[in-house]
Regions:
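Iron-sulfur (Fe-S) cluster-binding segments and ferredoxin-like electron-carrier domains
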Residues: 240, 246-273
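Extended hydrophobic/Leu-rich segments
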Residues: 1, 115, 278-282
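Long, charge-rich boundary regions
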Residues: 268-284
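Local cysteine-cluster metal-coordination motifs and their immediate loop/turn environment
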Residues: 136, 140, 144, 232-253
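Short, intrinsically disordered, charge-biased short linear motifs at domain edges
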Residues: 220-223, 228-238
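Generic structural signal of hydrophobic/aromatic residues within well-ordered alpha-helices
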Residues: 94, 252-256, 278
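ATP-dependent adenylation/nucleotidyltransferase module used to activate substrates
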Residues: 2-225, 248
């Protein structure tokens, strides 16, 4: 450990690069957000100084894990997979993302619509896909691994939480994903700094970005059309992403707005949707 502790001076700016850090460990889920962070980490620190970690928590399918591994392999980044299913075996009906859950993944509505409908019913706008404290668990696991992999050199834990994940009602402190909020990120960074004597930093480069801005940031960091389509965001399995669950809807809309999808064929080729649905996504 450091003989003299120098704590992070970024304060609330956890979406900016921490100073003096040359190593990074990334949370990789196989989706677009974490892939963007992985490309950014490799461009910033070099593949040899980056590690990717994926969680198997008993999700409905393992396609996203295969996508996460492929991303790491293509960038020549070390890939680690953790099985944390025992932690989530106590009540699998609490999240629609768990295999065997009685909750169903909502279709044909984006997250903003779902949140506003919940609020109208007087319900807390927490997503049915929220997994209890997963991000906190993930971040702390990455911190523990990073301390070993990087042999107690200062490093960053990078996660892909972004502003569209928060979805708070104005004036409320409850959002769709409570562990994706700036408040959570700032507090977690401080806790990591204290618990590691200043060795581990939380870096959330997408924290204040919308999904469309995430896609644009991915392009800036070298992601191509093919790279985006290798990622898997869909909550359902199959040979193609469904194009109808909330994460598919938000993803496709972002890729269209960012100019990555420019024709209906781009959508039809990669999602299980009709030509009519693809045209709606393209605004036709």
């Amino acid at each position: 450990m450091n003989a003299e502790v120098k704590y992070d001076t970024r304060d609330s700016k956890v979406d900016t690069l921490p100073e003096g850090v040359k190593y990074a460990i990334c949370a990789v889920s196989g989706g677009m957000d974490s892939a963007t962070c992985l490309f950014h980490a490799v461009r910033t620190y070099g593949a040899e100084n980056v590690c990717g970690v994926a969680l198997y928590y008993g999700q409905r399918h393992d396609i996203e894990l295969a996508a996460a591994k492929e991303e790491c392999d293509s960038l020549k980044v070390r890939y680690i997979e953790l099985d944390v299913t025992p932690i989530f075996d106590f009540n699998r009906d609490i999240s629609a993302l768990f295999a065997g859950s009685k909750k169903e993944v909502v279709q044909d509505k984006d997250y903003a619509t779902i949140m506003h409908e919940k609020i109208a019913k007087g319900e807390a706008p927490i997503s049915d896909e929220y997994i209890p404290n997963r991000n906190s668990l993930f971040i702390n696991a990455l911190c523990a691994i990073g301390l070993q992999v990087f042999e107690e050199k200062p490093f960053a834990v990078i996660t892909g939480i972004h502003s569209d994940d928060v979805l708070k009602q104005e004036g409320s402190n409850v959002g769709a994903y409570p562990d994706c909020s700036p408040e959570f990120a700032i507090a977690t960074n401080k806790a990591l700094q204290i618990s590691t004597s200043g060795l581990c930093y939380l870096y959330t480069p997408l924290l204040h970005k919308t999904k469309t801005q995430v896609a644009e940031f991915g392009k800036e960091n070298g992601m191509t059309y093919a790279d985006f389509n290798k990622t898997w965001s869909c909550y359902k399995g199959g040979t193609k992403q469904c194009g109808r669950c909330p994460t598919c809807i938000d993803r496709i809309n972002a890729l269209v707005k960012a100019g990555i999808y420019v024709t209906t064929i781009d959508i039809i080729d990669n999602y299980d949707v009709t030509a009519e649905t693809a045209m709606k996504y393209m605004g036709k």
